Amino acid sequence: MSVPTVLQKILARKAEEVAERRARVNLAEVERLARSADAPRGFANALLERAKRKEPAVIAEIKKASPSKGVLREHFVPAEIARSYEAGGAACLSVLTDVDFFQGADAYLKEARAACALPVIRKDFMIDPYQIVEARAIGADCILLIVSALDDVLMAELAATAKSVGLDVLVEVHDGTELERALKTLDTPLVGINNRNLHTFEVSLETTLDLLPEIPRDRLVVTESGILNRADVELMEVSEVYAFLVGEAFMRADDPGLELKRLFFQERGAVVLGADPD
């Protein structure tokens, strides 16, 4: 398993962070908090229902910064952004909680989820079952598993932990080898294809198109990164890809929800507002 240098650095710090979190709050307490959290909102179902109707199933991201681009949004109020996305037609939210590299916070996820009715994925680098239980404790409805950061045994363990606490799983791949591992190891219906090359950081929508034939029809493909204009959306929809994870394009807009509506709905002749019921 070849892990890109930037990702290695993030994962090394993440291992330290998890140890620090465990020292502050033990697993038994996190499990107690997870049991008392609001019921999951059905992240996978929200996407699957939209895709079934051939409507855009948009996971709208709340992200303050990134390692490569720095701060993306100075005026950063997660609750405000969440409400804007919900009004703009998002199916789900993605909230960055990584502190050191993305200037995220658990509090951002809590604030965003409390401000709307949308299901939320905790976007972070998951390497320990503790983080999965913690995700449920802070209110997440889904977690992300990045294949390039995990071996198959750990990936399966994390997915099993997610299932045990009622969380959906979005598995993220970057190439055919990772896709093969993901399909062999996990039964989650959500397969995210990141169009960004982790080694070169170049973005190409061809990554999604190239991998599509290898993905069983009972899995929902979520294309991630590189959706910047209406032509990009239509390219995916022609190939029957209806689920999208978009962050940077929205974060740089004055009104993120309005930008979402413009990109995915305005030129379709109809605007879908709000979240689908679970």
Swiss-Prot record:
Keywords tagged on the record: Amino-acid biosynthesis, Aromatic amino acid biosynthesis, Decarboxylase, Lyase, Tryptophan biosynthesis
Pathway terms, separated by semicolons: Amino-acid biosynthesis; L-tryptophan biosynthesis; L-tryptophan from chorismate: step 4/5
Coiled-coil blocks: none
GO biological process: L-tryptophan biosynthetic process
Signal peptide (residue range): none
Enzyme nomenclature, EC number: 4.1.1.48
Cystine residue pairs: none
Cross-referenced Gene3D superfamilies: Aldolase class I (3.20.20.70)
GO MF term list: indole-3-glycerol-phosphate synthase activity; phosphoribosylanthranilate isomerase activity
One Pfam family in the UniProt entry: IGPS
Annotated InterPro entries: Aldolase_TIM, Indole-3-glycerol_P_synth, Indole-3-glycerol_P_synth_dom, Indole-3-GlycerolPSynthase_CS, RibuloseP-bd_barrel
UniProt key word tRNA processing: no
Catalytic activity field: 1-(2-carboxyphenylamino)-1-deoxy-D-ribulose 5-phosphate + H(+) = (1S,2R)-1-C-(indol-3-yl)glycerol 3-phosphate + CO2 + H2O
Enzyme class of the recorded protein, top EC level: lyase
SUPFAM superfamilies, per the entry: Ribulose-phoshate binding barrel
Family: Belongs to the TrpC family.
Protein name in the entry: Indole-3-glycerol phosphate synthase
Species the sequence originates in: Pseudomonas aeruginosa (strain ATCC 15692 / DSM 22644 / CIP 104116 / JCM 14847 / LMG 12228 / 1C / PRS 101 / PAO1)
Gene behind this protein: trpC
